[in-house]
Amino acid sequence: MQVTVQKPTGEALVTQIKQLAISSKARQIHFLGKRRSTQFYLASESNLVLRDYVTSMLLLPAWKQALQSAYQPGDLLELRILRSGKLPYQGQSHLEDGSLVFVTQAAPYIGQTVRVQVAHVLYSVTGFVMFANLVSSD
């Protein structure tokens, strides 16, 4: 099956991208006259993830900005440590948007508010996962 994407803007572009993501039979996309090979992977029963092997997408900068976290490595935050993380020394917290934060060496501070520095941010299908280091326990 082939899907042809004209030169849409705004809401029409969003609609065409949604239709493309739903159509798991699409193997090639014609976007602005360029053929793109595409594969679809079913991440879960309800999530269809489009994996595009073409690195030069015209919309890539806009998508990157939309998917970028509000916090960057080096940012300082105050978080309440809610529970222990996967590793024995980690503490776990959440941001206002629901993003998960793992804090190194914060397990002793469960139930307390601590100051942390963002180490790195990962984007997953479920949202952002942030890793931070404990700055102080004050």
Curated annotation (Swiss-Prot):
GO cellular component annotations of the record: chloroplast
Gene, per the UniProt record: ycf81
Protein keywords: Chloroplast, Plastid
Protein name (database record): Uncharacterized protein ycf81
Assigned protein family: Belongs to the ycf81 family.
KW Chloroplast (keyword) present: yes
Organism: Nephroselmis olivacea
Main location: plastid
Cellular localisation: Plastid, Chloroplast
